[in-house]
Amino acid sequence: MSETLGYIHSVETFGLVDGPGVRYIIFLQGCAMRCQYCHNPETWAFTKDTAKTPQEAFNAAYRYRNYWRNNGGLTISGGELLQMDFVSEVFRLAHAKKVQTALDTSAQPFAPDDAEWMARFDKLLENTDLVILDLKEIDDEKHKKLTGHSNKNILAMAQYVAARGVHLWIRHVLVPGLTDDADGLRQLDSFIKALPTVRRVEILPYHTLGLFKWQNLGIPYPLDGVRVPTAEEIAAAEQLLHVQDYPDAPKD
């Protein structure tokens, strides 16, 4: 049987935000979501021109282990659950070397009614220390408009991961006029509070740093003219989500 391959978009060798400590981050190719504020639309297509074996991908990361110290490690992001078997094997290799692992995911491919898929996902979770999950919008209809997909399986994955005892970091992108209404944030707060393994909640302010990528790809940018949130709006959202109540909250 041929070895599982992973299709990698890019890597970051000294990441400081996608998990605890210093991280080596592998960004995989392929994503079914079409988030209106996506800053990496070039990763949507499932291209196969950058194939690596799990051992090759892990070996490239492990060269940077001296930077990780006690709390850093390896994060895999991008179209990760579309390449679940590859990620599972990379994380198995990482745990064999006592490397901390984090899965940064949109959770869109989560398939709780597919027994074979869930068996593979359980195998992945066995070697996953942290799941970083983007909860983009708590209202399902608004979520469909924002991303092109329902959030039902995404919320179900959050609950499943928490029930398995895996630590969670939750992120929410704050877009003025779209994802910032107080009632929606309160509902999101209630959902997150019911997840017993959440260690951190983050507000990610909307930005336009990826706008040029949409332009280069010839894709109309759906949020043209939308402003970035103010510091006051960010602080208000952080209060509504009680971000300082969680164990891994950044210390001032």
Predicted regions and their residues:
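Conserved AdoMet/S-adenosylmethionine-binding subsite of the radical SAM
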Residues: 62-66, 70-73, 82-204, 209
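Auxiliary Fe-S-binding modules of radical SAM enzymes
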Residues: 1-17, 174-252
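Short glycine-enriched, charge-decorated loop/helix-capping segments at active-site entrances
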Residues: 42-46, 144-150, 218-226
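Short cysteine/histidine-rich metal-coordination sites, predominantly Zn2+-binding motifs
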Residues: 49-59
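Short, conserved loop/turn and helix-capping segments at secondary-structure boundaries
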Residues: 51, 148-151, 228-231
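N-terminal [4Fe-4S]-dependent radical SAM core
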Residues: 1-27, 33-48, 63-70
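Active-site beta-strand/loop signature of hydrolases that rely on acidic residues for catalysis
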Residues: 79
